[in-house]
Amino acid sequence: IRCTGSKECYSPSY
């Protein structure tokens, strides 16, 4: 799981 500097976490699914 990745989290951006904003406040969003998501799985590496591009």
From Swiss-Prot:
Subcellular locations according to the entry: Secreted
Keywords, in A-Z order: Disulfide bond, Ion channel impairing toxin, Potassium channel impairing toxin, Secreted, Toxin
One example GO MF annotation: potassium channel regulator activity
Predominant location category: secreted
Keyword Secreted tagged: yes
One GO location term (cellular component): extracellular region
Superkingdom as given in the UniProt entry: Eukaryota
Tissue: Expressed by the venom gland.
Function statement: Blocks voltage-gated potassium channels.
Further remarks about this protein from its record: This peptide elutes at 19.98 minutes.
Family: Belongs to the short scorpion toxin superfamily. Potassium channel inhibitor family. Alpha-KTx 06 subfamily.
Comment block on domains: Has the structural arrangement of an alpha-helix connected to antiparallel beta-sheets by disulfide bonds (CS-alpha/beta).
Protein name in UniProt: Potassium channel toxin alpha-KTx 6 OcyKTx4
